[in-house]
């Protein structure tokens, strides 16, 4: 007995065909909307003032003025927030030795927010009339008259050549001295007047109260700082007179 061929349901065929047509029309409509949106956005970006830069905000800059940073970044050359080259601007600002890191962010529709991270000097490399601000890694931030930044410890330069601003000091003993200063809490570092990197015992400091601090190489610094803080607190609270403090072996 022969099987009868099943005739396709015309309603199903019509439904399938209609669904495909609807899908194609929807896709076409979406493409048109995307293209129209892109065209409108392009027009707004390049041919209107919809994204014109109206405000530039700086944060974190204490030693470099906003005006200096604007000039470094060439901000006057850019008027459009969307097309502004944030990477190039950041790199240009980082050419200033004070500037360690820059983050440039757009805040639509009209604002640029620029966060500055400045280098932090821990000592003043002293050459009598002139001095160099040094970071704890030996980076020379700037050259200043030696009577400025009196809150910073003076680091004896010895026979080490004056550094080039924007480069690092290479002398190992000086680097050890700076590492010690950088590893101290701010409150402890503020008690120091001078530092001698070239003492045979390692970095030795003169406090603002006149006694010496024999610190030694930058090892066990957390423990050394704790011991030193405890001794200085005791000296202050009990009005003791001392000639020196030796924390080379803190235990």
Region annotations inferred by a language model:
Residues 1-54, 67, 71-80, 88-91, ...:
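Charged, solvent-exposed interaction patches on well-folded alpha/beta domains
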Residues 58:
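Extended, alpha-helix-rich binding/interface surfaces that flank or overlap catalytic cores
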């Amino acid at each position: 007995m022969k099987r009868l061929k099943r005739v396709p349901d015309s309603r199903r065929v019509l439904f399938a065909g209609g669904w495909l047509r609807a899908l194609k029309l929807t896709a076409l409509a979406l493409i048109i909307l995307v293209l129209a949106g892109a065209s409108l956005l392009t027009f707004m970006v390049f041919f209107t003032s919809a994204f014109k830069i109206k405000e530039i905000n700086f944060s974190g800059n204490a030693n470099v003025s906003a005006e200096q940073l604007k000039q470094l970044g060439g901000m006057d050359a850019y008027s459009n927030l969307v097309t502004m080259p944030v990477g190039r601007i950041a790199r240009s600002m980082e050419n200033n030795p004070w500037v360690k890191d820059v983050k440039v962010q757009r805040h639509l529709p009209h604002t640029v927010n620029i966060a500055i991270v400045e280098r932090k000097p821990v000592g003043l490399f002293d050459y009598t009339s002139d001095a160099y601000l040094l970071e704890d890694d030996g980076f020379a931030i700037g050259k200043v008259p030696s009577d400025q930044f009196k809150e910073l410890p003076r680091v004896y330069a010895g026979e080490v050549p004056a550094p080039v601003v924007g480069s690092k000091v290479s002398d190992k003993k000086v680097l050890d001295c700076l590492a010690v200063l950088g590893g101290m809490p701010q409150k402890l570092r503020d008690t120091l007047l001078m530092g001698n990197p070239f003492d045979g015992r390692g970095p030795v400091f003169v406090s603002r109260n006149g006694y010496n601090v024999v610190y030694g190489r930058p090892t066990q610094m957390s423990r050394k700082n704790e011991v030193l803080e405890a001794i200085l607190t005791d000296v202050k609270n009990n009005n003791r007179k001392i000639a020196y403090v030796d924390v080379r072996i803190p235990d």
